[in-house]
Every structure is written in C-alpha cells, then in structure tokens.
Amino acid sequence: MPIAVGTIQTLGFPPIIAAADAMVKAARVTITQYGLAESAQFFVSVRGPVSEVETAVEAGLKAVAETEGAELINYIVIPNPQENVETVMPIDFTAESEPFRS
C-alpha cells in the first residue's frame, strides 16, 4: 500500500494542536513527528495511506482556519516519499508512534 507523509506548519501552538487532533480524527493516519520549526512556528507530520493523508491534511487545514488568531505558514502532502528521504529525514514511524500506526 502506498504510504504518504503530510505536514502542516502554523504560527503558534493552539492551531497545531487543533490540526493534529482533527487529522487523526478525520483519517486513518498516525502522527509521526511534532515540534518547533522556528520562533513560535510549530509543525505536525502524519503518515498513512495516500488518500488518508490527503483527507487528514484537509481536515487539519480546516481546523487551523477555524482556530481564532491562527496563521497557517505552510503545508505539504508527499505521496510515496523516496526511501532516501525516509532514511535521512525524521518522517518515518518511531517507537513512540508505532503503537498508534493504522
């Protein structure tokens, strides 16, 4: 099954927690990474089947738009990332995310 990665980046913490919550509720995806991108900018990444990641990112973007004062910085969905990308960048499933893998 083709696996994708989707990432949303926002200004501030409240919109990213809203996005993360909406993403895992809307689709069969697993949060693989969350963190501080730079000054007050946060990101969340999910993995799962391509169509599920697309659905999750759409739901996350909607949640950001509905969060008062939220600012979307950027987002992306990458279907079937190359093995080299998975190996070098921290987008793969981790020991923490594996129990929640769909």
UniProtKB/Swiss-Prot annotation:
Return any one Pfam family short name: BMC
Key words, A-Z? Bacterial microcompartment, Carbon dioxide fixation, Carboxysome, Photosynthesis
Which PROSITE patterns does this UniProt record tie to the protein? BMC_2 (PS51930)
Gene3D superfamilies to which the protein is assigned, alphabetical: 3.30.70.1710
InterPro entries in alphabetical order: BMC_dom, BMC_shell, CcmK, CcmK-like_sf, CcmK/CsoS1_BMC
SUPFAM superfamilies recorded: CcmK-like
| CDD domains the record matches | BMC_CcmK
The record's induction entry says: Carboxysome size and components vary with growth conditions. When grown in ambient air at medium light (50 uE meter(-2) second(-1)) there are 15 units of this protein per carboxysome, the numbers are stable under low light and high light, and increase under high CO(2) (at protein level). The CcmK3:CcmK4 ratio of 1:3.8 is stable over all growth conditions.
Main location, first listed in the record = other
Family, similarity comment: Belongs to the bacterial microcompartments protein family. CcmK subfamily.
Could you identify this protein by its name?
Carboxysome shell protein CcmK3
- Species assigned in the record: Synechococcus elongatus (strain ATCC 33912 / PCC 7942 / FACHB-805) (Anacystis nidulans R2)
Lineage summary: Bacteria, Bacillati, Cyanobacteriota, Cyanophyceae, Synechococcales
